[in-house]
Amino acid sequence: MKYLLDTDHISILQWRTGPAFTTLTGRMAPHPRTDLAFSIISLHEQTRGCHAYLQRARTAREVVHGYSLLMQVLRNFTVAPVLSFDDAAATVFAALVAQRLRVRTMDLRIAAIALARGLVVLTRNASDFGQVPGLQIEDWTV
């Protein structure tokens, strides 16, 4: 395993269309699937989005659509290993928090998983992830 996809790259894959999707899938094509992983944090973010949609749903059609979105998220997360936020990541996360970085908590958790496992984060969010010392990031949508 070499690369950890941030939630933004996962979302682009879910769109299945557009220039960012085409570029990203082209960059992924030469790599074996074993090189790529998702994080439990990204799964959390996406299921939280589905939950928020369902909380706002007012019609049966919206509820059905919300659960359809949730099913799609579950299917999408079966195509690559989902890495846990384990003790090693928690230790790295605590050290990063102590540095008072101005990075959102979920992004910092993803960064901690990557640092604990020596992975490169694939993301378009260089403004946040670029602040994390020692973290390697790449944007495969450009």
Give the ranges of each region predicted by the language model:
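Acidic, PIN/NYN-like endoribonuclease modules and their adjacent C-terminal/linker elements
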Residues: 1-2, 111, 115-142
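Active-site neighborhoods of divalent-metal-dependent phosphate/nucleic-acid chemistry enzymes
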Residues: 48-54, 75-122
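Short, well-structured N-terminal submotif of metal-dependent ribonuclease cores
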Residues: 1-42, 52-71
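Histidine- and aromatic-rich ligand-binding microenvironments
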Residues: 5-6, 39, 103-104, 125, ...
